[in-house]
Amino acid sequence: MNNLNSENMCNCCNSANSCGGTNGISWDREKCEYCGPCAIKCPNDAIMVVNPKGLELPSRAKTERANEFKMCDLCGTCVSACPTEALQMGKIVHNEKEYDRIEFTPSLCDSCGACVEICPQNVLKLNEEYKLKGFCVMCLKCIDACDKTNQNALSLK
């Protein structure tokens, strides 16, 4: 199982506390059918799915790279790079357990693109309609969508 969080990761961060904790959304490569409901349900386009053969799936989430399952891993590099503090590390409580999340304040964002350039997962993007897309807000919609496929490839750890 690939744990898509900041565990065992910190070489790219500017400070020790800029990385998220060891909690996050986990992806089980063996169970995943690259079917795409998790990416379609994600309100912030934080998940990009390409099937194992490299063909793009018909969804809002697309990537030029083949054979990848990319999503925000809450590493916090975008938080460190943001000069206006529009991005901050925060917490969400689910089933009485605290999880890391990245919080975005659009009114502080000047669309400089520093977070987009530094993101190690290459999931952040700027556009005219929404100032910033691609960060995980821990809404858990991807997990619900994956559960409906009976594959349970995504889980909260």
From Swiss-Prot:
Q: Does the keyword Transmembrane helix apply?
A: no
Q: Which UniProt keywords apply?
A: 4Fe-4S, Electron transport, Iron, Iron-sulfur, Metal-binding, Repeat, Transport
Superkingdom of origin organism: Archaea
> What's one GO MF term for it?
metal ion binding
Q: Which residues bind [4Fe-4S] cluster?
A: 32, 35, 38, 42, 72, 75, 78, 82, 109, 112, 115, 119, 136, 139, 142, 146
Matches recorded under Pfam families: Fer4, Fer4_7
Spell out the CDD domains in the cross-references.
Answer: MtMvhB_like
Enumerate the cofactors the protein uses: [4Fe-4S] cluster
Q: How is the cofactor bound?
A: Binds 4 [4Fe-4S] clusters.
Concerning PROSITE patterns, the annotation shows:
4FE4S_FER_1, 4FE4S_FER_2
The 4Fe-4S ferredoxin-type domain covers 23-52, 62-92, 100-129
Q: Check the record and name the PANTHER family matching this protein.
A: POLYFERREDOXIN PROTEIN FWDF, PTHR43193
Q: What is this protein called?
A: Polyferredoxin protein VhcB
